[in-house]
């Protein structure tokens, strides 16, 4: 059985329990006298260094860097899950007793939970540097929406579409361990982004990144929640203030809901000006993303979602506005699909509204008006080379027996009815062209002819290690059983990789593995040439690891 992070360190550790209360200022009352309590740290004791938490590669362009708005502990509570003090103790019981003994004095502030309310001029500001609580606003301006919408004979279809906040609910809650060894901080964490966590911890503590080592063991899921540096910086800091002893921090399920990350709730407004034949003359989209109290991944989610709007049903005249807005809710971050599920729900719901207004079958409407082969995206310049959208519609129609059920369910009455429907979904892997992509790979040839494979792209349950092993075996010419993938990542020895996100590991990591495998194969055959005195072009690795000559 694979070892989870909770089993991966010695049981001699300190417990850390963060104090969370729903208001403001703190006033510490001594609780160190409780047996087992080692240290109490408040927001007035920690370094006042703001740092970002999002799991994005570091950019040298200040305008392309994540917003640094977090402190290890804060005196300004912006949502229920903010940490204002921490107790380090020998046991969870002692830590909980100390938290109950603390007395905190608060000043209540007005709060705002709704995006539209938060954008009003008189709304309370969560961050003074962001007027109207708007973290970011981006636009799409394709063609001339205003002029195109005045074309005679157009039909206006308009709707508002809402998606809620949800939490990832991975089986394993987030946890981490931190200690000091030889003057360096060592962290074991259930994270998707070990190399990025190393950098964020260095930033938060104001120390060189090389003074931090992060190990990611086999973990129990993440789905984007663990694409943030959640509690590793605080855990590392607490270890430094107790003499480098091993400190453990793990979240309860309630804390995971409140204090980790959630999916952005997004409200979308779409207006389509449609010709009687179903073609679009002009379209407009407005997206309002509820960011919660802190930036985390911020505007990237709704910007990516809105960016997917013009492609699925091309229209020459599109206006788009996306807003990411702070509210006093839990901070929203990455979650599977990264804004695309919200965008697809809104867009496909709107297509159903269009079909209802026009009185046409929605399946046939999609076939006629969806992205064609040869379509070139104006932003990424990517071209659609395949007709797979039509293929999946055909397969879905056959599998569901869609046409028969659609006729059968047409004229139902009564409180309980059956329905059948269809929707399209498209998603692009990786983060280009917003960011550059990179991946590193190391292959070591063992004495028995097997290879050890290391990469910085993390396995979190999605199966990328299996794909990596298959790719490596194919590239070198050996059986998959002879490829040993090192599942754990250790920033001291693992090649650099940005981690698990954007459905990118197999796609991006595959290039690094293919190139590394080709290089290893070349070196193996070069050595074989020296032994056999054969020309390199006459040798190959075939039949699962056998070197053969074609002479």
How would you describe each model-predicted region?
Residues 1-131, 159:
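Flexible, low-hydrophobicity surface segments
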Residues 110-116, 360-369, 403-415, 480-484, ...:
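Flexible, glycine/charged-enriched surface loops at secondary-structure junctions
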Residues 13-47, 84-106, 175-243, 300-310, ...:
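Alpha-helical support elements that line or immediately flank enzyme active sites
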């Amino acid at each position: 059985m694979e070892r989870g992070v909770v089993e991966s360190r010695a049981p001699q550790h300190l417990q850390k329990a963060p104090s969370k209360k729903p208001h403001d200022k703190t006033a510490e009352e001594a609780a160190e006298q409780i047996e087992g309590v080692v240290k109490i740290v408040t927001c007035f004791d920690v370094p006042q260094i703001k740092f970002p938490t999002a799991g994005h590669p570091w950019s040298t362009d200040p305008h392309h860097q994540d917003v640094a708005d977090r402190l290890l502990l804060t005196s300004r509570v912006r949502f229920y899950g903010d940490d204002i003090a921490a107790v380090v103790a020998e046991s969870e019981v002692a830590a909980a007793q100390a938290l109950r003994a603390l007395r905190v004095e608060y000043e209540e502030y007005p709060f705002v939970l709704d995006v539209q309310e938060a954008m009003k001029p008189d709304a309370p500001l969560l961050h003074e540097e962001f007027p109207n609580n708007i973290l970011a606003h981006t636009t799409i301006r394709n063609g001339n929406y205003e002029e195109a919408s005045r074309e005679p004979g157009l039909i206006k279809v308009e709707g508002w579409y809402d998606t809620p906040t949800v939490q990832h609910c991975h089986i394993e809650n987030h946890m981490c361990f931190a200690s000091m060894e030889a003057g360096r901080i060592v962290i074991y964490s259930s994270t998707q982004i070990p190399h990025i966590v190393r950098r964020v911890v260095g930033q938060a503590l104001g120390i060189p990144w090389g003074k931090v080592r992060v190990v990611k063991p086999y973990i129990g899921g993440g789905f984007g929640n663990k694409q943030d540096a959640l509690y590793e910086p605080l855990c590392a800091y607490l270890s430094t203030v107790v003499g480098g002893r091993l400190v453990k921090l793990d979240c309860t399920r309630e804390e995971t809901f409140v204090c980790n990350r959630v999916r952005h709730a997004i409200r979308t407004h779409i207006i389509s000006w449609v010709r009687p034949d179903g073609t679009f003359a002009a379209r407009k989209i407005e997206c309002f993303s509820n960011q919660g109290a802190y930036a985390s991944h911020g505007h990237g989610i709704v910007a990516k979602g809105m960016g997917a709007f013009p492609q699925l049903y091309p229209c020459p005249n599109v206006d788009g506005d996306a807003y990411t807005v702070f509210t006093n809710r839990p901070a929203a971050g990455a979650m599977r699909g990264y804004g695309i599920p919200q965008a697809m729900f809104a867009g496909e719901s709107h297509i159903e509204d269009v079909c209802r207004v026009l009185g046409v079958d929605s399946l046939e409407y999609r076939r006629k008006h969806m992205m064609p082969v040869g379509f070139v995206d104006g932003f990424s310049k990517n071209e659609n080379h395949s007709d797979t959208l039509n293929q999946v519609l055909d397969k879905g129609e056959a599998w569901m027996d869609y046409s028969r059920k659609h006729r059968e369910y047409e004229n139902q009455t009564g409180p309980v009815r059956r329905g059948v429907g269809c929707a399209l979904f498209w998603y692009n892997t990786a983060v280009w062209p917003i960011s550059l992509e990179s991946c590193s790979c190391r292959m070591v040839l063992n004495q028995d002819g097997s290879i050890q494979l290391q990469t910085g792209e993390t396995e979190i349950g999605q199966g990328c290690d299996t794909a990596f092993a298959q790719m490596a075996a194919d590239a070198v010419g050996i059986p998959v059983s002879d490829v040993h993938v090192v599942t754990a990542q250790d920033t001291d020895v693992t090649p650099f990789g940005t981690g698990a996100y954007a459905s990118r590991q197999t796609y991006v990591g595959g290039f690094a593995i293919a190139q590394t495998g080709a290089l290893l194969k070349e070196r193996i055959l070069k050595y074989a040439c020296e032994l056999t005195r054969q020309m390199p072009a006459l040798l190959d690795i075939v039949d699962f690891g056998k070197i053969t000559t074609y002479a």
